[in-house]
């Protein structure tokens, strides 16, 4: 007679054992490690912490086995961030909200609990999208109630088990200019914000903490670059570009021209001084703006070679000259040419006569720019090719100047950002380009 074998599998055994371990921890039994966070003591079991955290595993495995009690100080986490993670280790349930999400994410990253950190990042992303759309609904509910009702039906909660963005297009409610500008200022991860967002995902397993977070405002520090890159959706941004291209084929009125120029030059966030100017004229004026200011404000005379260099950029039929200027270190951008010409001329962000840059300097200061977003749309079949040589696809989103190479745009963007890495060792003056610093040092050599 053969041996009979019976296998019993209990699905709830692991959860039951974890619950009993949590009871032992709360009662203080068999706790062999003490964790000190901001002068607060937490008792726990080494085996539980080492099983759920690679950080604790590395710390505890190297210690002597005979040490019955050890004390571990965590200096880089807070009590607010550590407490939910300790509860998660013993209960497999994580409770976070918009108030403690930053501390929990920092503690999870420090303790190498990457699955929890990923969940916190997705919650932050969905919470930001949800709160932004709720503000839009309250702001535009009276103007377009039909679209807003459809919007409410499309998003029910800021969080889901997958925390992914719904892959469908929703009716978009327009918001006021004042609302857009305030949102741009409060979001430090992105220099540009468009007024289009995606819908929030549906809830599969909602919890009370998520429901409470629905009515709370999101702090500006929640918008991390790695969780909510640049604050815009690439799909809706491409649709916005297509709509702008299609509008160029129509003949609009004066108000339409003003809105179109504003969208094109400053991504719907800057003011246009002349609303009756066509879009092509504005491009030319923006390109020539720096040269006009140089002739008006510079007190000392400009050399003939430098003035001819800046004038040759917009002369038709000078393809070879223009290409040489783009490659030359003396003329990587229009703004940097002005800085090399005169040391007494203030930078673009401090010039009072340029109304186009006045509103953008506050939000573009000390910001790293995602240059890949500024690739202008390709020339459509209805537009004529540029008479100034090859097309310049790289456009500055602040002043509208176009460049042939991305390196020239990067150099030009330093002017708007206020970053001046090159400093004179004699007088302490800072410059955007190394060539400007070199020309400035010639002054000291001439004086000495």
UniProtKB/Swiss-Prot annotation:
It is found in: Nucleus. Keywords: DNA-binding, Metal-binding, Nucleus, Repeat, Transcription, Transcription regulation, Zinc, Zinc-finger. GO terms for cellular component: nucleus. Its main location: nucleus. A zinc finger (C2H2-type) spans 394-416, 422-444. CDD domains: BTB_POZ_ZBTB44. One of its GO terms (molecular function) is zinc ion binding. Residues 289-298 have a biased composition (Basic and acidic residues). It comes from the Eukaryota. Residues 299-313 have a biased composition (Low complexity). SUPFAM superfamilies: beta-beta-alpha zinc fingers, POZ domain. Residues 289-320 are annotated as: Disordered. InterPro entries: BTB/POZ_dom, SKP1/BTB/POZ_sf, Znf_C2H2_sf, Znf_C2H2_type, ZnFinger_BTB_dom_contain. Residues 31-98 form the BTB domain. This is Zinc finger and BTB domain-containing protein 44.
């Amino acid at each position: 007679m053969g041996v009979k074998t019976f296998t019993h599998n209990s699905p709830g055994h692991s959860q039951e054992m974890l619950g009993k371990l949590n009871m032992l921890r709360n009662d203080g039994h068999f706790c062999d490690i003490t964790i000190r966070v901001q002068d607060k003591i937490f008792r726990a079991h080494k085996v539980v912490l080492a099983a759920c955290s690679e950080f604790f595993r590395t710390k505890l495995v190297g210690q002597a086995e005979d040490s019955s009690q050890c004390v571990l100080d965590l200096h880089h986490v807070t009590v607010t961030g550590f407490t939910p993670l300790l509860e998660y280790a013993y209960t497999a349930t994580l409770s976070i909200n918009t108030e403690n999400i930053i501390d929990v994410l920092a503690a999870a990253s420090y303790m190498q609990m990457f699955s929890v950190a990923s969940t916190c990042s997705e919650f932050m992303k969905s919470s930001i999208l949800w709160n932004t759309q709720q503000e839009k609904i309250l702001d535009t509910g009276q103007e377009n109630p039909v679209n807003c009702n459809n919007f409410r039906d499309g998003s029910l909660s800021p969080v889901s088990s997958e925390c992914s963005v719904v892959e469908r297009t929703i009716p978009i409610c327009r918001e006021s200019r004042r609302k857009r500008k305030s949102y741009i200022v409060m979001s430090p991860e992105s220099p540009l914000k468009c007024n289009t967002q995606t819908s929030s995902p549906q809830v599969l397993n909602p919890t009370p903490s998520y429901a409470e977070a629905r009515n709370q405002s999101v702090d500006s520090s929640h918008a991390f670059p790695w969780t909510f890159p640049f604050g815009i959706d690439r799909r809706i941004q491409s649709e916005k570009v297509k709509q702008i291209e299609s509008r160029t084929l129509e003949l609009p009125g004066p108000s339409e021209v003003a809105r179109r120029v504003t969208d094109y030059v400053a991504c719907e966030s800057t003011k246009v001084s002349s609303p009756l100017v066509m879009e092509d004229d504005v491009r030319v004026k923006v390109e020539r703006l720096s040269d006009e200011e140089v002739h008006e404000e510079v007190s000392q005379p400009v050399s003939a070679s430098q003035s001819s260099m800046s004038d040759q950029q917009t002369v038709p039929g000078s393809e070879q000259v223009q290409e040489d200027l783009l490659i030359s270190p003396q003329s990587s951008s229009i703004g940097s040419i002005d800085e090399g010409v005169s040391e007494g001329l203030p930078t673009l962000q401090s010039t009072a006569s340029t109304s186009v840059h006045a509103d953008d300097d506050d939000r573009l200061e000390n910001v790293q720019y995602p240059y890949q977003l500024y690739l202008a749309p390709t020339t459509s079949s209805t537009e004529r090719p540029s008479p100034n040589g090859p097309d310049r696809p790289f456009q500055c989103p602040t002043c509208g100047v176009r460049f042939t190479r991305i390196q020239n745009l990067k150099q030009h963007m330093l002017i708007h950002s206020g970053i001046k890495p090159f400093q004179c060792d004699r007088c302490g003056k800072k410059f955007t380009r190394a060539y400007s610093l070199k020309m400035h040092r010639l002054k000291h050599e001439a004086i000495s």
